[in-house]
Structures are given as structure tokens and as C-alpha cells.
Regions:
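N-terminal leader/targeting and accessory segments in enzymes
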Residues: 1-111, 291, 297, 315, ...
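Short loop/edge segments at beta-strand edges and connector loops
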Residues: 18, 67-68, 105, 159, ...
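Phosphate-binding loop of NTP-binding sites
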Residues: 103, 108-258, 262-273, 328, ...
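Short secondary-structure boundary segments
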Residues: 67-70, 201, 223, 258, ...
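Short, active-site-adjacent cap segments at secondary-structure transitions
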Residues: 72-74, 162-165, 205-207, 261-265, ...
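Short, glycine/acidic-enriched loop or turn micro-motifs at the edges of active sites
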Residues: 71, 203, 226, 260, ...
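ATP-dependent carboxylate-amine ligase
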Residues: 1-15, 33-39, 49-52, 62, ...
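Acidic, Mg2+-coordinating active-site environments of NTP-dependent enzymes
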Residues: 10, 73-74, 82, 91-96, ...
Length: 520
């Protein structure tokens, strides 16, 4: 528990109405998580306004409400919290419920500062590693954690696939959770004696101030591509780039991909010590002599790491140059933990990342991969990489998420038409959009390759399970099939409901023989 009066010293506020001499039992920003004595912070989300949930928070036992002062209006009966659908009298909350109401200019900023203070600033009590980039955050986080664990460090993780507090693994809704959840997790890591935390830091997480009160000992920049632009994400690429660059002003050591064309913009105004990694340019850590090997149902990447005067041969089960970049970032981080070269090589050789180039096809004679590639850059990198293994045919199955960038659909369709031998267009997470419309927009991209002299070969199968079964039914020796877009996800989101659907499960069932006969 923390005393409210002490917590309020951590923020700038406009007013405090009610008794601030009270103990707080918890802090949260979702009304369903409120319990007796909680401090509830009202934040605005993409779809919901947290101020609308004040009545629910009060019913669940909230002791303190932190609200945006724009929603507090003076009336004849006193100040009221007013939204389009809700009106609550502040004095009645104080009189009838003994609730304290705090008004601030920015509730997200307040949530971050209050959360850090409530959990006693756990980020200051272990090494913090933050990883950002359009693609590769999850793989780099797993590679980094794997290397550090191989060296005997106790490592916590926060990222797209899961959080790990040193003892328990949990799935998370967002790549970078809300700040109250981040600091709760960090606090558990400290309790479980973690030496460090590896965290994926999304641009949205930075923009929404979820990491505002964390100073990272090491910040890693992987890459940036024109993605995540649109309603509910970033308004422009410049805004997206700026959000990514903020990590370099929030860390002690910045490790950057020297080959990314926007690296100088990422470093603009940086306050950190800078190190770099590269395949194409002289850098602190480099990779060269890369080559790829396809066995019976397996793919391997081989390369040489060059660091100062040292050279080491490395083998990974993760295919492709983009994964070599991810490995270089992880190796660069490991250098600050004095990890032995053999430990680095051993960790990289065995690391598997759920839903990231995950090979499902041992012994099948062909390779069936599941990958999270869900934008043009990641799909292009993936398909170009798989081409280097010289498969008999390269078959790709993918869709695009609804309520996300529309341009992404054409771009991914064009990329698939240009790089794959056969494409199966299917449904991803349509969310609130018509899946058929999304598939048609992907098809437009495939057809667009005709202008470049390519005649794309493809089929549309809306049912994702049926699309996988169709791919397995047509698979031949030395084919590579890749199911892209959802990776580790265990659901399909349709009109606000998440239905159970796990690519790994449906692929395994298809490979085990549950394939229907198709006539197309």
C-alpha cells in the first residue's frame, strides 16, 4: 500500500477534492480491475473513453479517481465529471462515497508516474533493455533473453507473445502494456530476483507514455518502415519515426542498425552513447559470409560474426538475413553483460521463437513455417529469404488485419505476387471490416504485378483452416509453405469478439492427416 498524499508528490495536478490522507491498495486504468481502495485513472483509448467508466469503478470500490480536467465542468450544484454519455457530481462522490477526485492535464502521463511510484520504481532496481523497430522486436527479445539465460542471468520479459516475471508466464494484450501493468510486472520481477528485463517497446507504447517513467540501460533500434500509419495508429510516418526515436533519448546506451536508411533520423537529438551493428557497413558488430541450408524439413542460417578483432561462426535455426540482424542486436546487448562467446553461439543455435519462422514440418519432406509477418516489409524480407533456400515452390498463405492500414493490403498482395510461386489469400483478423473486401484489396495488389510482367498464381479461401488444408494437400518435396500474419496468436478477431484460432494447431492438425479433398 502507498499513501495517496505521497503519490501525488510525483505528479503535477490541477486540483485535489476530497481526503488525500488515505492508503491506496492498487492502481489501474480498467474499471473491471478495480478493487476496494484502488486508484482509478481515466484514460482515453482508441475506442473507449475511460471517464465513461467512472460509475463502474466507483461500484467496484475505487477510493481515488484521477481525471482529465477537460471532463470536469463547474455547475450550479458543484463540479461534475461530464462525458457524452455520463454525468457524475464530484461533491456527491466525496460526500456519499468518500472518494477523492484528482484532476490533471494529462491522465496518461499521470498514470505512468503514479504507477512507477506506487510500485516503488522497480525499473531502477534491475538492468532494463528496451527494443524497438517495425519488425523483429519479438525475435530479438527472445534471442537476447536466451543468451543472457545461457550465461546464468535471471531474465524477465515483456512483449508481444508473453510476459515472464522470472517464475510465471502470462499472455499480454499489447506489445507494450499500459504503464500500471508494466510496473506491476517489473515489481514482480524484482521480487523474483531478476537481474534484468528485456522489453519490447512499441511506438504506440512510447506515444501513449506507457514507458515514460522507465530509463533503459540499453535501447535497441532494429528498423523502421512506412507501416502502422492510419486511424488508431500514427497519423504520419514522421510521427511514427519520431516516436521510435524517443527511445534514444530515454536510454544510457543506444544500439542501432547502421544499415537502416533512417538511422540518422532515429539518432537525431539522442542523449545516449551510441553503438551500431551492420551487415553492409563497418560497425561495432558485423555479420559476413552468410549462407543458408535447406535439409529435409529444416532450414538453417550460417554466418560469421566480426567484433573488434574476433571472428566467430554462428548457426541458427531461424532463417534469413532479417534474423541475422536480430541476432547481431542480441549479440551487441550481450557484450555489455560479459557473456562468453561459446554461450552466445550455444544460445543462438537452439533458440526457437513461437510463431516466428516456426518450423512445423519435421520429416514431411517439405517445410511448413508459421510467421508473424503482417506488413509489406516483413513479408518481403521473409519471402526473399526463403527464396535463398532454392525451394521447388514457395507457397504463401496470408490475409491482412481489419481496421489497419489499407495500403498495406495492396503492398502485401503485390509482394506476394512478385516473390511467391503460389499465393493463398485468406482471412486474418478482420475486426470490424468485411473480410471479403480485405481479400479483394489484397487481390488488387497481386493483379498489379501484371504490369511488371508477372502473372501471379493464386486462390482465395476465406476460411483460414481450409486455406492451410489446401496448402498441405498440394505440397510436394522441397516446397516451402509459409502461413503469415498471425504467428503466435491464438484467436481470430471478428466484430469485437476473439474466437479461438491458433495457426500452430491448425497446421499441426493438417500435417497429421486431417486434410479434406479439394477440387478447385
Amino acid at each position: 500500500m502507498q499513501l495517496l498524499r505521497s503519490l501525488l508528490k510525483q505528479i503535477s495536478y490541477e486540483s485535489v477534492r476530497g481526503d488525500d490522507d488515505r492508503k491506496i491498495t492498487d492502481i489501474c486504468c480498467h474499471s473491471e480491475k478495480v478493487k476496494e481502495g484502488s486508484l482509478f485513472v481515466c484514460i482515453n483509448g482508441y475506442r473507449n473513453n475511460g471517464h465513461e467508466y467512472v460509475p463502474q469503478a466507483v461500484e467496484h470500490g475505487a477510493a481515488v479517481l484521477v481525471v482529465d480536467d477537460r471532463y470536469v465542468i463547474e455547475s450550479r450544484s458543484g463540479p461534475v465529471i461530464l462525458t457524452e454519455h455520463m454525468k457524475v457530481n464530484v461533491y456527491e462522490l466525496i460526500r456519499d462515497r468518500n472518494i477523492c477526485v484528482v484532476t490533471v492535464r494529462d491522465t496518461r502521463k499521470a498514470l505512468s508516474a503514479l504507477s512507477a511510484a506506487f510500485f516503488d520504481h522497480p525499473a531502477e532496481r534491475m538492468k532494463m533493455i528496451g527494443i524497438t523497430g517495425t519488425n523483429g522486436k519479438t525475435t530479438t527479445a527472445f534471442l537476447t533473453a536466451g543468451i543472457l539465460q545461457e550465461a546464468g542471468y535471471r531474465v524477465g520479459m515483456i512483449g508481444t507473445i508473453e510476459s515472464y516475471d522470472g517464475r510465471r508466464r502470462e499472455t499480454v494484450k499489447n506489445t507494450t502494456p499500459e504503464s500500471c501493468e508494466i510496473h506491476r510486472l517489473l515489481s514482480r520481477m524484482v521480487e523474483n530476483e531478476c537481474d534484468c528485463c528485456v522489453m519490447e517497446v512499441s511506438s504506440q507504447g512510447i506515444a501513449l507514455q506507457r514507458t515514460a517513467d522507465i530509463f533503459f540501460d540499453i535501447g535497441v533500434f532494429l528498423n523502421i518502415e512506412s507501416d502502422h500509419i492510419g486511424k488508431g495508429e500514427h497519423a504520419t510516418f514522421s510521427e511514427y519515426l519520431y516516436c521510435k526515436s524517443r527511445l534514444m533519448r530515454q536510454c544510457g546506451i543506444g544500439i542501432v542498425n547502421q544499415d537502416d536508411p533512417n538511422v540518422d533520423k532515429i539518432l537525431a537529438g539522442h542523449t545516449c552513447e551510441v553503438e551500431n551493428f551492420s551487415i553492409r557497413h563497418p560497425s561495432d558488430v558485423m555479420a559476413e559470409d552468410e549462407w543458408y541450408e535447406m535439409g529435409s524439413g529444416s532450414l538453417q542460417s550460417h554466418f560469421t560474426v566480426k567484433k573488434e578483432w574476433q571472428r566467430e561462426e554462428v548457426v541458427m535455426q531461424l532463417p534469413g538475413q532479417f534474423n541475422i540482424y536480430n541476432a547481431l542486436a542480441a549479440i551487441s546487448v550481450a557484450g555489455h553483460f560479459k557473456v562468453d562467446r561459446e554461450q552466445i553461439k550455444a544460445a543462438l543455435a537452439k533458440q526457437v521463437v513461437p510463431g516466428r519462422c516456426q518450423n512445423m514440418s519435421a520429416g514431411a519432406g517439405y517445410v511448413f513455417l508459421i510467421d508473424y509477418a503482417h506488413n509489406e516489409m516483413s513479408l518481403r524480407n521473409l519471402l526473399e529469404t526463403l527464396r535463398k533456400f532454392e525451394p521447388a515452390r514457395l507457397i504463401v498463405i496470408f490475409g491482412c488485419g481489419g481496421n489497419r492500414s489499407v495500403l498495406r493490403r495492396y503492398q502485401m498482395g503485390e509482394t506476394a505476387g512478385r516473390l511467391a510461386d503460389f499465393t493463398i489469400i485468406t482471412s486474418d483478423n478482420p475486426r470490424w471490416e468485411d473480410p471479403g473486401r480485405i481479400m479483394n484489396q489484397i487481390e488488387d495488389g497481386l493483379r498489379g504485378t501484371v504490369r511488371a510482367g508477372v502473372k501471379p498464381s493464386y486462390i482465395k479461401i476465406a476460411d483460414r483452416r481450409a486455406a492451410v488444408e489446401y496448402a498441405v494437400s498440394m505440397a510436394e518435396k522441397r516446397d516451402i509453405i509459409v502461413l503469415a500474419g498471425k504467428g503466435h496468436e491464438s484467436y481470430q478477431e471478428i466484430k469485437g469478439i476473439r474466437y479461438p484460432l491458433d495457426d500452430r494447431k491448425i497446421v499441426q492438425e493438417a500435417l497429421d492427416g486431417g486434410v479434406r479433398e479439394y477440387h478447385c
